[in-house]
């Protein structure tokens, strides 16, 4: 069983005729993802690597039913593209756009929640259910990083994702579904909102979260564990442990407020809730072995 996407997911790629959209749509197809059509306004009738292009999601979905949307759309057009997918009835959306205006990110999240949809991103490298389907810009072909197994991964960091996931594989494990929630201040979906999906998935035996300085997503995970809303073994790695106090760095979401958001505070919360925290990526595999045997 996979989370968010699987081998039967039918994907529309919005922004498919752009350089990034065309490049990564091909890689999504090459992995086995069912990319059923693409969208670029004004370019209906074109073809991108065998993917038919339509003017809008509504027009394309009449000929090619789809249940997932992948957006390769600039930040200033992302809100409209998300709303277009929602209006067409799509409930699972992923957007890689980095720098979506804050007020529009809030509107996107509210709109998705109001209609029972889930938007992952922006500022994410994407989602992969290993061996089944991929959304975004994930280098699925690196076997030492993306091997199928029983560990779910949630990440805020694109650069740390490959490093930590490689350590999971080196430790003798593999990945069910990896979801990059993104590093912006207002992500469409937060770690704690994804935990119930991993909790319900029989193929996921443990979860690794790749967090970082700032925000409160990791503390929210600890709260879910304390409340027994998530009961599976959990290992966390947090980037920014040695960051100088008061220095601006990293993603827009790397903001410490009201004493919350520090790596020290996140670590204490996760440990108190029963999770394990790796001080460096190389410790992740050993911690999983200790928990899973």
Swiss-Prot record:
A biological process term (GO) from this entry: tricarboxylic acid cycle
Protein name: ADP-forming sulfoacetate-CoA ligase subunit SauD
Active-site residues (renumbered): 251
Family (UniProt): Belongs to the succinate/malate CoA ligase alpha subunit family.
Induction, as annotated: Induced in sulfoacetate-grown cells but not in thiosulfate-grown cells.
Organism: Bilophila wadsworthia (strain 3_1_6)
SUPFAM superfamilies recorded: NAD(P)-binding Rossmann-fold domains, Succinyl-CoA synthetase domains
Stated pH dependence: Optimum pH is 7.5.
This protein's encoding gene: sauD
The keyword Ribonucleoprotein is annotated on this UniProt entry: no
List of residues binding CoA: 17-20, 43, 96-98
Record's keyword terms, sorted: Ligase, Nucleotide-binding
Reaction equations catalysed: sulfoacetate + ATP + CoA = sulfoacetyl-CoA + ADP + phosphate
């Amino acid at each position: 069983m996979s989370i968010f996407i699987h081998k039967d997911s039918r994907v529309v790629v919005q922004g498919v005729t752009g350089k990034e959209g065309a490049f990564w749509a091909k890689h999504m197809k090459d992995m086995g993802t069912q990319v059923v059509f693409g969208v670029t306004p004004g370019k209906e009738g074109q073809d991108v690597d065998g993917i038919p292009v339509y003017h809008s999601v509504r027009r394309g979905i009449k000929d090619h039913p789809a249940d997932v949307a992948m957006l390769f759309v600039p930040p200033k057009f992302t809100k409209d593209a998300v709303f277009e997918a929602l209006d067409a009835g799509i409930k699972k959306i992923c957007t890689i756009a980095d720098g979506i205006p804050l007020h529009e990110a809030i509107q996107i999240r509210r709109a998705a929640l109001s209609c029972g949809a889930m938007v992952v991103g922006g500022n994410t490298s994407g989602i992969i259910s290993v061996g089944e389907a991929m959304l975004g810009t994930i280098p699925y072909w690196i076997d030492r990083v993306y091997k199928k197994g029983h560990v779910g991964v949630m990440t805020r960091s694109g650069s740390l994702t490959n490093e930590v996931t490689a350590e999971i594989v080196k430790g003798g494990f593999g990945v069910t579904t990896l979801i990059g929630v993104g590093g912006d201040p207002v992500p469409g979906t937060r770690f704690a909102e994804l935990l119930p999906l991993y909790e319900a998935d029989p193929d996921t035996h443990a979860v690794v979260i790749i967090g970082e300085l700032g925000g409160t997503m990791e503390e929210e995970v600890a709260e879910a564990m304390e409340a027994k809303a998530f009961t599976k073994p959990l290992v966390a790695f947090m980037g920014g442990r040695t960051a100088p106090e008061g220095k601006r760095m990293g993603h827009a979401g790397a903001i410490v407020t009201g004493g919350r958001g520090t790596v020290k505070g996140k670590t204490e919360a996760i440990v108190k809730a029963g999770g394990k925290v790796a001080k460096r990526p190389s410790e992740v595999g050993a911690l999983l072995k200790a928990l899973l045997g």
